[in-house]
Amino acid sequence: MAAEDPSVSGVSGRYATALFELARDEKSVDAVKADLDKFNALLDESADLKRLVRSPVFGADTQLKALNAVLDKAGIAGVAANVLRVLTTNRRLFAVADVIRAFNALVAKYKGEATADVTVAEPISDKNLDALKAALKTVTGKDVALNVKVDPAIIGGLVVKLGSRMIDSSLRTKLNSIKHAMKEAG
């Protein structure tokens, strides 16, 4: 399965594939995904946790003790906790974000879903999110999960990445196009 999806490759892909197959066999795909998403959110929120995960300065024992404390406090257990411990023991914790991303890609494929990365200038309403999901479902023929990121630098509009396709209707891109057209004309 991993060879079919370019986002599921390398070391991260192997861990994600093994994790997915184990979760599928135990019929706990949704629970594992929820736990990994919870850990990913903690990683995004905590600079200290990011440093622990990324820095080679911390030994495996130190990382494992800290990770166990985080997992206990967050209520992450079972298969998801075990794979995080294995990553730590094998000195691969730095790849956890890629493992989670690859696992989510495998889950989406398993469920017949597609995942789109959406960048907006300001938070988008639920009504508009639902309309965007419906439009993307019409195009892809699949249910579409959205990963929404707010980036004020795009000024307005949105950027949608779905697989190898990208739709950029941001105001920043339109202004850059006008700027280039004016440079060529003048």
Swiss-Prot record:
Top-level taxon in the UniProt lineage: Bacteria
Pfam families (UniProt xref): OSCP
InterPro entries named among the record's database cross-references: ATP_synth_OSCP/delta_N_sf, ATPase_OSCP/d_CS, ATPase_OSCP/dsu
Membrane topology: Peripheral membrane protein
GO cellular component, one term: proton-transporting ATP synthase complex
Sample GO molecular function, one term: proton-transporting ATP synthase activity, rotational mechanism
Cellular compartments annotated: Cell inner membrane
Keyword Ion transport listed: yes
Record's keyword terms, sorted: ATP synthesis, Cell inner membrane, Cell membrane, CF(1), Hydrogen ion transport, Ion transport, Membrane, Transport
HAMAP family linked to this entry: ATP_synth_delta_bact
Subunit structure: F-type ATPases have 2 components, F(1) - the catalytic core - and F(0) - the membrane proton channel. F(1) has five subunits: alpha(3), beta(3), gamma(1), delta(1), epsilon(1). CF(0) has four main subunits: a(1), b(1), b'(1) and c(10-14). The alpha and beta chains form an alternating ring which encloses part of the gamma chain. F(1) is attached to F(0) by a central stalk formed by the gamma and epsilon chains, while a peripheral stalk is formed by the delta, b and b' chains.
Protein task: F(1)F(0) ATP synthase produces ATP from ADP in the presence of a proton or sodium gradient. F-type ATPases consist of two structural domains, F(1) containing the extramembraneous catalytic core and F(0) containing the membrane proton channel, linked together by a central stalk and a peripheral stalk. During catalysis, ATP synthesis in the catalytic domain of F(1) is coupled via a rotary mechanism of the central stalk subunits to proton translocation. This protein is part of the stalk that links CF(0) to CF(1). It either transmits conformational changes from CF(0) to CF(1) or is implicated in proton conduction.
PANTHER family found in the cross-reference section: ATP SYNTHASE DELTA CHAIN (PTHR11910)
Protein family (similarity comment): Belongs to the ATPase delta chain family.
Protein name stated in the entry: ATP synthase subunit delta
Organism: Bradyrhizobium sp. (strain ORS 278)
